[in-house]
Amino acid sequence: MMVKLICAIVDIAGAAFPIDIDTNELVGDFKKVIKAENSRTIACDANDLRLFLAKTDGRWLTEFEVQNGVADISVFEELDVVGAPLNMIGLSEETVSSVAITKELVKAKKTPLHVLVVPSEPVQLQRKLWLVTGTVVNALGSKGIRRHLHLMASLHIGFYDPTRRVDNKNVAFWYEAKNLCFHVLFKSSTCFFYVSPF
């Protein structure tokens, strides 16, 4: 029996997506489909994905709740048996279609979400990440600016953005002519401002 499962990648805003799959398929097959549908967003191999049933206290999470952040995935059941058919682990056609979708639910973004996806790489699971992006004009001629930006990266307080991969590589810094561009994710608790002495 084919079902449409709504999935969301944890901690990537706007990363909810539908997957059409037969409920007789296995968890391992489901991981491959998720990876194939999100090859630019998910950097790790399909077998390194962790999947969780997006249900708590008998109720599906909503897209609105997931967009506001999932604080603790440990309260959700992990779908960690690769050989388990989806219809035996809470993703049967009956359980998935148990909520009638109405205009009100759609407008409030309270439609049910079925599966939480946690990639193992390249971003460690965090509650909230801030994106810091920008350009340093004429960085090749500015003394010390490259050193400060690369030092910030080497302190391991920033993370690569899995949505920004070039030629299958993580990219946080790159040059466009003489301008140094940066695109880094930070834990909100470690963000800081730097005022250049130059």
UniProtKB/Swiss-Prot annotation:
Q: Where is this region: LQLFLAK domain?
A: 16-55
Q: Which residues does UniProt assign to the signal peptide?
A: 1-15
Where does motif HVLVXXP motif map? 114-119
Its GO CC terms? Answer: extracellular region; host cell
Where are the stretches annotated DWL domain? 56-113
| InterPro entries referenced in this protein's UniProt entry, alphabetically | Crinkler_N (IPR045379)
Q: Where in the cell is it found?
A: Secreted; Host cell
Q: What is its main location?
A: secreted
Q: Which family does it belong to?
A: Belongs to the Crinkler effector family.
Name it.
Crinkler effector protein BLC01
